[in-house]
């Protein structure tokens, strides 16, 4: 029989992997497919969580909170992509500086409205049954996070590789001018992708705010972890993001249980090794 501590550590790692995938999947869409350096993605996660918290305070309906957080950040993403990023498209330095500045504004706005103390969204009872699994009792909401991440991964894969919309997106990444010449409005298409990226970050913020807590500063932590996931898996690869999230989540869980002082720094070890051996990531491709 497996040691209960090891079972708990593995399950916690899978839960963290699920949350990281929800965040990183949005980042890999913006960073990998659109070549947009969106370093405000962590701030999207943070603000989405607090918007969901506000909706939950009013409605007490968790699904509305998740939808409100996602849609609210999708609107913020629309503003950012069409008003701010459109004018500096392709200039990576300008995109980096702009998104860093935008994330700082969001963090300060959150601090002004909700304060600096940690807040969390109440877990609904119907999403949090006590589940007996492999000899231990485990919170059902953590398993829900894992299930949700699997559903999102499958949905993204179907959209990108089994639909005409996905074919247009991938063609637009490879040759924007050719797709535009075919009469496809590539600008609107990429705006839609960026809004989806923001929606995923906002929804992940509500999930993370229910699983853990929300506080200014968590945006930077999860931005860094999402970047690690995307770099390990390969930019633009949903499957790579899933592998990167799984690896990072398990490392965070095991290092937190056995080497707590080194927990965060150890997550960078596989990224360094993979960058040295395969700079494009496990499932990524070279970007010219």
Indicate where each model-derived feature is located:
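Membrane-interfacial amphipathic/re-entrant helices at transmembrane-helix boundaries
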Residues: 1-22, 51, 59-64, 91-96, ...
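Cytosolic-side transmembrane-helix boundaries in multi-pass membrane proteins
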Residues: 5, 113, 174-181, 185-188, ...
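Membrane-embedded helix boundary and interhelical linker motif in transport proteins
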Residues: 11, 33-79
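Helix-loop-helix "hairpin" substructures at the membrane interface of multi-pass membrane proteins
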Residues: 16, 22, 137-214, 238-243
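Transmembrane alpha-helical segments in multi-pass inner-membrane proteins
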Residues: 20, 24, 61-71, 191-201, ...
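Hydrophobic core segments of alpha-helical transmembrane domains in multi-pass membrane transport
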Residues: 49-53, 70-76, 102-110, 148-157, ...
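Alpha-helical transmembrane segments within multi-pass membrane transporters and channels
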Residues: 60-103, 109, 243-248, 278-279
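Transmembrane helix-bundle core of multi-pass membrane transporters
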Residues: 87-162, 189-192, 254, 258-261, ...
């Amino acid at each position: 029989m497996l040691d209960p501590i090891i079972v708990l550590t593995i399950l916690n790692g899978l839960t963290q992997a699920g949350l990281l995938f929800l965040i990183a999947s949005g980042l890999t869409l913006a960073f990998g497919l659109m070549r947009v350096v969106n370093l405000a993605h962590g701030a999207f996660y943070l603000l989405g969580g607090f918007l969901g918290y506000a909706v939950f305070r009013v409605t007490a309906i968790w699904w509305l909170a998740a939808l409100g957080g996602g849609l609210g950040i999708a609107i913020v993403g629309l503003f950012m992509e069409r008003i701010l990023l459109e004018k500096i498209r392709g200039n990576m330095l300008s995109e980096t500086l702009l998104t860093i500045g935008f994330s700082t504004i969001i963090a300060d706005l959150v601090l002004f409205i909700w304060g600096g103390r940690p807040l969390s969204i109440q877990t609904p009872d119907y999403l949090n049954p006590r589940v007996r699994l492999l000899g231990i009792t485990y919170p059902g909401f953590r398993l829900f996070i894992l299930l949700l991440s699997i559903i999102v991964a499958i949905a993204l894969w179907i959209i990108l590789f089994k639909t005409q919309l996905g074919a247009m997106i991938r063609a637009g990444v490879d040759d924007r001018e050719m797709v535009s010449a075919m009469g496809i409005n590539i600008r609107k298409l990429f705006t839609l992708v960026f809004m989806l990226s923001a929606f995923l970050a906002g929804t992940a913020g509500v999930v993370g705010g229910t699983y853990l807590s929300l506080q200014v500063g968590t945006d930077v932590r999860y931005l860094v972890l999402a970047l690690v996931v995307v770099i390990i898996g390969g930019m633009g690869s949903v499957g790579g993001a899933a592998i990167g999230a799984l690896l990072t989540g398990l490392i965070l869980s095991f290092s937190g249980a056995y080497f707590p002082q080194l927990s965060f720094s150890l997550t960078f070890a596989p990224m360094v090794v993979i960058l040295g051996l395969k700079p494009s990531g496990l499932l990524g491709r070279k970007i010219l």
